[in-house]
Structures are given as C-alpha cells and as structure tokens.
C-alpha cells in the first residue's frame, strides 16, 4: 500500500470495480490479486466443474479461474483455494490427445478458435475445448455448464442393438480410415468411442484385415485374458470381424452402467503433480505406496503387468498406459484395470513398415527379482503364447505370428525360470 500511496479500502474498491477482469484470493493469510486471462472465443475465465458419480448423480466438483500468464485458480468446498502454475492435472489428462484427440481437433476446426492440427493447440485452446465441446471424456469430470447440458443430452441418445453393431463399426472404420488428422505417431491405433445396448461404454480399436495391427488386436484380447487368469484386474475385451476389418471392443472401466462414472487419472498426470519422475511403472507404483495412494497389492499388480510386458514384447509402457481410479469421495481407489498391453515391438512403425517377427528380448529393468511377481507373469505369458499358437478366434491370427509364438513362449519361460520360487 505504501508504494501505491493508497489505503486498503481504496484498493478494495478499485478491485471491486475491476471484478470482471481481476480476481482476488488468499493463500494462508496473504491476499493476492490477479488479472483474469482472455480466452479464445471470449469464453468466461470463471467456470464451474461438475462430476458424475458412480450412481449417475451429478455433483459439484470445483470452480476455476484462469489467470493471465497461464495459471489456474481452483476453489473447492472442502480444500479451499489452490493455485496451479498451468492447468490442473485433471484438465491436462482430459484434454484431447492421440488418435481420438486428433479426431476431436478435426471435428471442431471449423470454429475459428481452434487450430486444425492438435499439435498447434496450446493451453488456451485446451481450456476452450474442455468448457465448450467436451462430452463423454475419460473419467467423471464435466467442464462448464455448456458441456453439462451436452452430457444430459448425451444420455438421451438411443442405444444401438447388438445385431446392428457390426454394421455401424464398419461404417465408422470406413469413415476414419480416410482421415489422417495430421501425422500419426508410428503404431498408434485408430479407434472410436461407442455405447451399445449389449457392450455398454467401449473404446473400439480397428485395423484392416491382413495388416500387422489386425494380427495384434487378437493378441491384445489374449493378453488381457491371460493377465486376468492370474489375478490381475484387466479391461474386458471382445473381438469382432467383418470381411474388411478386425475390431476390438475394450470395456471402459470408468463407466458404471449407462450413466454412472468413475474418476480416473493417468499415471502421467499423477506423477507430474506429485513426483515429477516418469521413470518406470514399478518405480511409480512404489512411490504411490509410500505416499498412501496405492496398496502393496496394487503395486504388485503393476509389477506383474511390467514383467508380463517384458515376456510378451510390450515395448510401449509409457505413463498414459496405466491409470489410477478415484472414488466418489475423491480418494484414490487403486490402480485401474490393465489396458493397452500387447506385443507392441511388432506394431507397424508408420509408412507401411512392419518390424521383423523376431523373438522377444526380455530384460529385468526395474522390476527386480521378486519370485511371486515373475511366477505370476511367467504363468500369464505361458498361457498367452500358447493361446496365440493354437486358439481360433473371431479374428484370425496369421501363420507367421503363430510360428513366432512358439519361439517366444520358450524365450519367455527360459528368461523367467531363474526368478521362480524353488
């Protein structure tokens, strides 16, 4: 006040007069003032966030204010005020990314506020999308009143009957295969979201028959089943095939019935917020156990997922491929069911190039030598490669992949043998 040569009351009156563009808040006993951000399309920088509970009921989550310079002010009923340097982790997680994200960017590109390419989006574009266009996001948060109304409208959409589903899937695949949405990362799987009467909420991956990815989708189905058989929770999957395409339905574990939802955050969002490491799955799980976010059982499941990945050639173990569930009370509920675990070392690398079908090369990495972890992973891997060798599925597995499975089964079992309980 001395530097400004004004009284506190004069400053307060000035701030009230500027309330449309300036906000004030306290961190502890210290008052702060901040300029609100100008967002694309003139979107209000003050917004509400709701959440959909597992029962389908809608609850208040937080109010947010977007500040000049990129910060975000979060106001909740329980925890008071929190200031983030950028977007809160749940917004970064919910923002469009990957193949689905490029679909969304393409669909809103006719609005002047959004660049055509997702690569050109910044946080302002992400905020604008989340609070004007986002519907049916991962997790249970709904951003803004406009999107809340869209979610209520979404509940009224008629569900497609099971016998009509494959026809719709083929139509979606035909439409999406002609759209690149910008340069796709090598091996990234085309997919779309679906709600069916028989399947519920699913993510549908697809590939043209005869392609390498058409070989790998049945393997993802078998990998999920093999992990589940040794006690690791996994996403439920189902294979379908038409004359042209192979489809893999992955049941969404963040959905409960037709209307209920479960909160979730990727390991990347959690790690960025609390640890800033992004090293390996087992190390992340160990940190979460120490912080009280995960149980030792959860950490063991993560280690089994990592060890199993080594034994099947899953080289794509980034921090968006495991997630944590959040209960209705806002507490971490545990590790999410396993998903996106398959032999990605054989996935197409772009430009029509497929890696050679050579045997896997497992490594210990940071998994350690725990006998129970390797016993479970080895058992799952044996079941997996045996199924790849012999099982007849709705979508066929090629002869070269079946022949490779026999060699990989031996490599996996030989590698795990020294770690197994005596």
Locate predicted features.
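Phosphate/dinucleotide-binding and metal-coordinating scaffold of catalytic cores
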Residues: 2-319, 323-422
